[in-house]
């Protein structure tokens, strides 16, 4: 047996089965595999009937389901040979398979503007004096407008005063610790839409983490586990890759949202001031409680949600359809 180590959701992944026989016999082979996605908890039993020709060695490809991302574990439940009529069977001795493969979500590039919100704590904030960033609450430098600059960067009062467009460059915070919260749910009541939502949440989580790394911003990724919260610090590409492998192996959250007390312990331990929650379910009471602890931005992934943002409450809420995320149509987010 040969199973590739990785694939991307929706792409082909196949288990290679090589059959070697001492004599060319036309007996058929019956194989049964048990597959489990550790992320979603979904189990599947796969039964394969092979009909080898007369060659001593033959290879077969068994396609596997990659509709949903996650870490898949594959075991051989039974294997044997059966006669042409399927009446008599003989099990194979000493044949086993304990394989696994990681199916990654679609990878997309997103530019994010992590601005310090009105609920953020300003105490102890410091900024890089040599590099510009995306925190528009602190000015890095003032300069003349250049082609390609966003009009959001224009300082209109100074521009009117001096007669030329003046741009306000944002600063790069050096102790502005950001947390990404995974909040995808393993509910089965949405049918096929559940796979799309899970893929979209994991795609968005990976895109935000990579976008922060590109800006030189180390950050923390948090998800629920049996003990309350699993925390990983991301400050390099190697750390990002390890985080993705871990997140795709950890079971999705139950219907209950993040435990505010568990998150508060993480927030204090890691000095978190900005939190980006990626979720497929909105729990208003829990979000209000989180917003009281941290500067909170929420990315809500919905099956049929209309794209848009709401900044009227205690946190910034952005709605994005799942198919828009996996389709790579989201290019910029202000969080």
Predicted feature locations:
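Exposed, interaction-prone extracellular/peripheral surfaces
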Residues: 48, 124, 147-335
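An amphipathic, basic-hydrophobic helix/alpha-beta surface used to engage anionic
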Residues: 1-230
